[in-house]
UniProtKB/Swiss-Prot annotation:
Keywords: Ribonucleoprotein, Ribosomal protein
Keyword Kinase found: no
Protein name as catalogued: Large ribosomal subunit protein bL28
Superkingdom of this protein's organism: Bacteria
Disulfide bonds: none
One GO CC term on file: ribonucleoprotein complex
Statement: the UniProt record of this protein carries the keyword Repeat: no
Gene3D superfamilies: Ribosomal protein L28/L24 (2.30.170.40)
Listed GO biological process terms: translation
Length: 62
């Protein structure tokens, strides 16, 4: 499965590792993904991967 949030569609970002000598190498900033079970309208449940921020939003608004 892709490293993307199923709700917001956010994916990993790219950036740099910066050493003390200011040498830069490329790196990826990954999401804090969590696997949760979501109840659908027809009564079934489904596992999806969502970011921790979206999980907070779901808990706040439900």
């Amino acid at each position: 499965m892709a490293k993307k949030c199923a709700i917001s569609g956010k994916g990993p970002m790219s950036g740099n590792n910066v050493s003390h000598a200011k040498n830069r190498t490329k790196r990826r900033f990954l999401l804090n993904l969590r696997t949760v079970r979501i109840a659908l309208d027809d009564g079934t449940t489904r596992k999806i991967k969502i970011s921790a921020r979206e999980l907070r939003t779901l808990k706040k608004n439900s």
